[in-house]
Design a protein with these regions (language model features):
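Short active-site neighborhood of thiol/selenol oxidoreductases, capturing the structured segment around
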Residues: 12-15
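C-terminal scaffold of the Radical SAM
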Residues: 2-9, 30-55, 59-238
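Local cysteine-cluster metal-coordination motifs and their immediate loop/turn environment
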Residues: 17-30
Length: 238
């Protein structure tokens, strides 16, 4: 494609709704146990990318983000197919940031990650949330801290230059000491980026329905966790 006129850059977001299982706090649109729909969804998303491409004809795409759901659960072949469609029908900056959200339980195969890296993905965002297996179970997460370490090692082996970790504070029963340990554990993996979010109980989620029986850090404790993260990460170069 040739660009008649360059306007402001665009970011593309591709939603991949499939999950192995739905987490207790998540209110994003996602489907668990529907692997039978993956091929049809991939084909439909590719058609949609082609249909709307003319609207972006005068724009350079500088970011591409595959979110979900659990995009890594779609499998590398389908993901590569979608990224090829993006590159074919859009003006993607050669230096564009191309991110794939992944859960640690579906990001441990370094050969699959290498295929994604070779296709053009250059950033992995891992939904770690906690390094404490008890906290992870309370969230309905199906991975372990061991799998987090294995996933990051696989990303490094596959030559991903940018690995980001998502963490959540204010979890049911979480203490400041547990949060401090989660942060220190996370830094042992030397991620390029960390995102820290306060837990929010969204209406309609399992955690929201259980809210009266949960022991949650109060607002002051959550604020302390936030401030600790800001200072601790600043001291460590983030």
């Amino acid at each position: 494609m040739t660009m008649a006129k360059q306007a402001h850059p665009l970011g593309l977001y591709l939603h991949i709704p499939f999950c192995r299982s739905k987490c207790a706090y998540c209110d994003f649109y996602s489907l668990s146990g529907r692997e039978d729909r993956m091929d049809a969804y991939t084909a439909a998303l590719e058609r949609h990318l082609i249909e709307v491409a003319p609207q972006a004809a005068q724009h350079l795409v500088d970011t591409v983000y595959f979110g979900g759901g659990t995009p890594s659960y779609l499998g590398e072949k389908r993901l590569v197919k979608l990224l090829k469609a993006v590159k074919k029908h859009y003006h993607v900056d050669p230096h564009a940031e191309i991110t794939l959200e992944a859960n640690p339980d579906s990001a441990g195969d370094w050969k699959a990650l290498r295929a994604l890296r070779r296709a053009g993905f250059n950033r992995i965002s891992l939904g770690v949330q906690s390094t404490d297996d008890v906290c992870l179970r309370a969230l309905g997460r199906i991975h372990t801290w061991q799998q987090v370490q294995e996933a990051v090692a696989a990303c490094r082996r596959a030559k991903f230059p940018d690995v980001s970790l998502d963490l959540i504070y204010g979890l049911p029963g979480q203490t400041m000491e547990q949060w401090e340990k989660t942060l220190s554990d996370a830094l042992t993996l030397q991620p390029e980026h960390l995102s820290c979010y306060g837990l929010k109980l969204e209406e309609g989620t399992p955690l929201y329905r259980q809210r009266d029986s949960l022991t949650l850090p109060d607002d002051e404790a959550q604020a302390d966790m936030y401030l600790y993260a800001v200072e601790y990460l600043r001291q460590n170069g983030y």
